[in-house]
Amino acid sequence: MASSSSNRQFSHRNANTFLTYPKCPENPEIACQMIWELVVRWIPKYILCAREAHKDGSLHLHALLQTEKPVRISDSRFFDINGFHPNIQSAKSVNRVRDYILKEPLAVFERGTFIPRKSPFLGKSDSEVKEKKPSKDEIMRDIISHSTSKEEYLSMIQKELPFDWSTKLQYFEYSANKLFPEIQEEFTNPHPPSSPDLLCNESINDWLQPNIFQSSDERSRKQSLYIVGPTRTGKSTWARSLGVHNYWQNNVDWSSYNEDAIYNIVDDIPFKFCPCWKQLVGCQRDFIVNPKYGKKKKVQKKSKPTIILANSDEDWMKEMTPGQLEYFEANCIIYIMSPGEKWYSPPELPPTEAVHSDRS
């Protein structure tokens, strides 16, 4: 994200495409037909699909596609079929890719005529080829082309480059996350909606509408919300029920930051232990963070509000300098809870005996 490579838009341009669908039980024949139809404009000449099994028994699908004109796409989900998302690679050596796909297939389907490419070692004897030791670049290129998941990618590196694996594991984990990103599942809110029982609901509703529920101009800047009050009053459950969010408790971990979140929650973290508090409270854009076990990266492409939740004994405002407090008050709606207030409605009382007797 902070690196230049991660800011580049996805792009694939090649007449030979190698696709890997991890955890995909799709029938190879059906997959072939669907992929073939996707690339009609580039005049498909050949496709091979094979279904294989991981060691854990789960299924994955490999596909080699050859077209007359180079496939040119900028949408990383162009080759998605029935909800399955592939790793998209250029097949630099179609002969090797085809051999790899056909090594241990459970089911295979082909369409068209395979177009072989000349071997890069053409003209050399077998002994010369065997004596040539592959470079690290060649080993990594082979691993990138043939791995089907994060686990397999790291396992192949550990096997082929054990010293590099043991000394540079965090960099390989970073590249594994880039090659095999987690597909965001459709958000299902596990926290039921609640109606706060407050003395001043209006101030909260006035904050919710423009900052959470209403879409706004990307150039506009949101405003954060600070809630301080007793424990066991439903603050966290209410805050988490509003929609997709980044949630931090005890510490702020940027490694799993979700750009698609609508807002952030800082829950029960003392002021002195909240890094980038100004950027979060001020709903700033495009600031740099430093994850504990990763590279620095740029986050928050658009302005996002932050809900800060604190108990009375760790009130942020008591820890701030006058200058910090001035910034905080300018960028935050502050709600200090009164005795008896809750962030959920009180349960309905059961009918009295008198009501029962009247109905009878």
UniProtKB/Swiss-Prot annotation:
Entry's free-text remark on domains: There are 3 rolling circle replication (RCR) motifs. RCR-2 is probably involved in metal coordination. RCR-3 is required for phosphodiester bond cleavage for initiation of RCR.
Stored Gene3D superfamilies: 3.40.1310.20
Cofactor: Mg(2+); Mn(2+)
Amino-acid positions noted as binding a divalent metal cation in the UniProt annotation, renumbered to this chain: E52, H60, H62, E104
Domain CRESS-DNA virus Rep endonuclease: 11-114
Keyword terms: ATP-binding, Covalent protein-DNA linkage, DNA replication, DNA-binding, Endonuclease, Helicase, Host nucleus, Hydrolase, Metal-binding, Multifunctional enzyme, Nuclease, Nucleotide-binding, Nucleotidyltransferase, Repressor, Transferase
Cofactor notes: Divalent metal cations, possibly Mg(2+) or Mn(2+).
UniProt-annotated location(s): Host nucleus
GO terms classed as biological process: DNA replication
Motif Nuclear localization signal boundaries: 292-303
Ranges for region Oligomerization: 175-187
Family, per entry: Belongs to the geminiviridae Rep protein family.
Stretches for region Transactivation: 252-270
Motif (RCR-2): 60-62
Protein name per its UniProtKB record: Replication-associated protein
